Amino acid sequence: MLNIGARIVNTSRMRTIQATRSYATKGAAPVTLKNHKYTVHATAAGQGRKGEVKSLDGDTPFSLHLAMPKAMGGKGEGTNPEQLFAMGYASCFLGALQMMAGKTGKKDAARNAVIHTTVHLGEAEGLGGFGLAVDIKVEGVEDEELIKAGHEACPYSRALMHGAVVNVSKA
């Protein structure tokens, strides 16, 4: 198994575009999109980590009750943002790995791949507040070059490694 670590903290620089603020990783050119192949919307309301999230887009709209994890003083009676991030990252990484296996003629090499992600939430060193660290374990694939190619093609990995444009505005 190859471990690939990704780390994200809030080392952002800001530039103002009209009434919207765009954030990107300091010192790096963020990944910019030349088009939008798919867009999804989500809404969070209530008490933040103890509130509700919903997405009404796509074929299967859904909503979840959020709860503070026991490790952070909560009751752990619901889903938390880190779980959602870990699941999204794992599935996205698997898709990117399988896509790259197909593009490089190694489809069979990723046929039995299983992606395990661990998301750590902790105090961001030197920044205050919280930051994230991610551990990715790739099971069932021996080809390290293929794993690297999957990591480089994964949109989640790209956002964490290179930054993403994040526009924040008043509704």
Each predicted region: which residue ranges?
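Extended beta-strand/beta-hairpin segments
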Residues: 2-87, 94-171
